From Swiss-Prot:
InterPro entries: DNA_clamp_sf, Herpes_PAP. Pfam families: Herpes_PAP. Residues 1-16 have a biased composition (Basic residues). Belongs to the herpesviridae polymerase accessory protein family. One of its GO terms (molecular function) is DNA polymerase processivity factor activity. Residues 313-322, 330-339 have a biased composition (Polar residues). This is DNA polymerase processivity factor. The gene is U27. Gene3D superfamilies: 3.70.10.10. It comes from Human herpesvirus 6B (strain Z29).
Amino acid sequence: MERGSRDHHRDHRDHREHRELREPPTLAFHMKSWKTINKPLKAFTKLLKENTTVTFTPQPSIIIQSAKNHLVQKLTIQAECLFLSDTEHFLTKTINNHIPLFESFMNIISNPEVTKLYIQHDSDLYTRVLVTASDTCTQASVPCVHGQEVVRDSGKSPLRIDLDHSTVSEVLKWLSPVTKTKRSGKSDAFMAHIIVQVNPPTIKFVTEMNELEFSNSNKVIFYDVNNMRFNLSAKNLQQALSMCAVIKTSCSLRTVAAKDCKLILTSKSTLLTVEAFLTQEQLKEESRFERMGKQDDGKGDRNHKNEDGSALASKQETQYKITNYMVPTKNGTAGSSLFNEKEDSESDDSMHFEYSSNPKRQRCVV
């Protein structure tokens, strides 16, 4: 009897020691797939700097999310690019993008010199990041961020318009004169307005300087259309479109007219998904856009007045913000890191557009 008890305790101790020595659940990149998205990731590093968190999920996936006023941007690295050793015991974990030893998580995954990257779950309080490069092998225990919400696209959309990559690039060039100015403010000169009309199906991009219009074609496809208007920050719209332009696929425009009406831009590839959630800005005074809208309402169906974006704008109080736990940085970057590369703003990875302003109204039909 006594011998059996000793054997039982010994087996229990051996099992506990084996469990403690066992490798913790580990998330890693498939290196072959990772190398194919290295260049897009480097471009995203320049677009996702401030107020950015990284979430690891057991699907597996990696979600990088950045929040600012009236704009949330999300980059998802899909399961086809990842390997997870233990899906049962790996729990969803969120950390800051800023990692002092490496500068940022985005800086790690976009560095071509990295040969191995492991994310390990062995504590609810922190995430262990192990990095191997050509001349270094190191690890860091990064504190977890708790209670951070990942913004998700939910609900049926009354609007869906697909723009091909060349059209997205054209809109970015057209926005350039407004967004290049060094002044800042919420005056109408810094606003971009989007008008969607049903008959005939058209989408207009309007600023105080100019406007751009597209009708149904093989480059701009209207699936679900309703008369709608959006008042957006021109810089927010430019940044959202720049995110979608990186992976060079079509960009889908949708909306969720719920608690806070959002314009959702989505672009997808096999390994990456980009989403941008824009909420409307409130206009303090009647703008050229509003005056033009009143003229359009006189020509169109009066029943669509209730769908005016200005009526929905009053619902835009809830904003997704990342606040007190973020690490303050200078110009969106930290001081030192193992991968201390200088960014060249004129490199091939930069999103750089030139556009000559034309005061006349433009209409694009293919």
